[in-house]
Amino acid sequence: MRQQFLGALIGAAFGTVFVLVNSGDPLPSAIGWVLRALAVVALAAVVVLGVRAGGRPTLEGRPMFGPSYRVIVIGEVVLLVAGFFVLSLLDAPVQANVAWIATVVGLHFVALASAWKARSILVVGVVLTVLGVVGLALLGSAAAWVPFVSGVLSGVTLLGGSLYGVRRA
């Protein structure tokens, strides 16, 4: 399996989870189910396009999942755990968790864009980070919408970025 396809598949899988988990209230039920179905279709499209692309090399032979990737993922885990701890100390609403996850995952992609010298994922990273920060800002006034803003829209961003990446491969 090509490394770039594996990366797109991981992004699409997490994007699908973001949409599946966060497409509930305050969205109308029918819209939530449509969003969930579209996310699954997008994930399937990433799989089909990735398999059809075959074994073409990517990233000019550089390893995607080398030492820099591992350092970034370890940093991501530390930030997630520390952030959840701080949010619990602050008695933040449960919706804060998805906003924090989106923020940290966005920063993860920004760091990966630099490590991999792949500007295409920088856009995904910046958008996810912004959606996470907006979700955190909404906690004081519209917490019910945080799962949509930081969850569903982040999932759509990951799925779109994965489709873009696998089409370019």
PLM features: what roles do these ranges have?
Residues 1-22:
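The first (N-terminal) embedded transmembrane alpha-helix
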Residues 10-14, 73-85, 127-129:
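Core segments of transmembrane alpha-helices
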Residues 17-74:
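Selected alpha-helical membrane-embedding segments in polytopic membrane proteins
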Residues 20-33, 85-96, 138-146:
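Helix-coil boundary and interhelical linker segments in multi-pass alpha-helical membrane proteins
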Residues 32-44, 87-103, 150-153:
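Structural signature of hydrophobic alpha-helical transmembrane segments
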Residues 48-63, 107-116, 160-169:
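C-terminal ends of transmembrane helices
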Residues 81-126:
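Membrane-proximal helix-loop-helix units in multi-pass membrane proteins
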Residues 121-169:
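Terminal transmembrane helical module of multi-pass membrane proteins
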